[in-house]
Design a protein with these regions (language model features):
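Flexible "cap/lid" loop of the alpha/beta hydrolase fold
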Residues: 97-102, 106-141
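Gly/Ala-rich beta-loop-alpha elbow adjacent to hydrolase catalytic centers
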Residues: 88-92, 96
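Alpha/beta-hydrolase fold catalytic core
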Residues: 1-20, 41-44, 81-83, 171, ...
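Conserved alpha/beta-hydrolase catalytic His-Asp/Glu region
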Residues: 122, 137-192
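Conserved acidic catalytic loop of the alpha/beta-hydrolase fold
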Residues: 67-84
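Conserved HGGG/HGGXW glycine-rich cap/lid loop of the alpha/beta-hydrolase fold
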Residues: 8-58, 206
Length: 257
């Protein structure tokens, strides 16, 4: 694994036992502002890093889950945090699974949000194709960028999510704030299984799934329990893939229960 990168960390407030949130692909700590504050109000010190190649954190070519986890381990060591309640959504959930296998001493409790320890085939490729096809030099405004994305990304909410990664440099030129090239090249790895057969963490574990999402299927339960024998699976029926947005109150309850 490449040397760990120093992650930018957003402190979302609170005092008490530390709870660390790992965001998903094309996300950042900003996505967790509201849910993080809600968790902090329940008596936790909540921290959310920008993972490598995302948000304001440094870029690196290695997007393996071992590398993502090692960055977070270095952050926990630097801040003298641990054992923590580790919460990971989607890609961040896979990074969290990898971390508990590599450094079980740093995690008191694991919450994995709407992702299973397996490979996924078809996800997000359309979004990356749309980002890669967008000629930033021809973009006149954020609205213009959204209209250009609409040709490939039909869902308004997904276009808005992609556009959270579009910024302007000092000269006012549009640029991606994510390392689009490294993430595109690493999609097979990001979509892959973060765990190897036989890896087990027997700490307290909860998998949260959105009732309207198909990321965690009933047939994934056996695989989940093979790696995490103490895991339970809680479904938030009103939510899709992003329960921290779509069902925040239920998400906070299920995360802390």
């Amino acid at each position: 694994v490449s040397a760990p990168l120093p992650l930018i960390v957003r402190e979302l407030g609170g005092a008490g036992a530390p709870l660390v949130v790992l965001h998903g692909l094309l996300g950042s700590s900003r996505n967790w502002q509201s849910a993080g504050v809600a968790l902090a109000e329940r008596g936790h010190r909540v921290l959310a890093p920008d993972l490598r190649n995302h948000g304001s954190s440094p870029w690196g070519d290695d997007c393996s889950y071992a590398a993502l986890a090692a960055d977070v381990v270095a952050m926990l060591d630097r801040l003298a945090l641990g054992p923590v309640h580790l919460v990971g959504h989607s890609m961040g959930g896979k990074a969290a699974m990898r971390l508990v296998m590599d450094r079980p001493d740093l995690v008191a409790r694991l919450t994995v949000v709407d992702i299973a320890p397996r490979a996924y085939s078809d996800r997000v490729r359309v979004e990356f194709a749309a980002m890669n096809a967008l000629d930033l030099s021809a973009v006149k405004s954020r609205k213009d960028a959204e209209e250009k994305l609409a040709a490939q990304v039909s869902e308004w909410g997904m276009r808005q999510f992609i556009l959270t990664n579009l910024g302007q440099d000092a000269e006012g030129r549009w640029r991606w704030t994510v390392n689009r090239e490294a993430l595109t090249n690493s999609l097979p790895e990001i979509l892959g299984n973060p765990l190897a057969a036989g890896e087990v963490w027997d700490g307290p574990t909860r998998f949260l799934r959105g009732g309207k999402s198909n990321y965690i299927r009933d047939e994934d339960f056996a695989t989940i329990r093979a790696h995490f024998p103490r895991a339970d699976v809680v479904t938030l029926p009103e939510s899709g893939h992003n329960p921290h947005f779509e069902a925040r109150a239920g998400f906070v309850e299920a995360t802390l229960a």
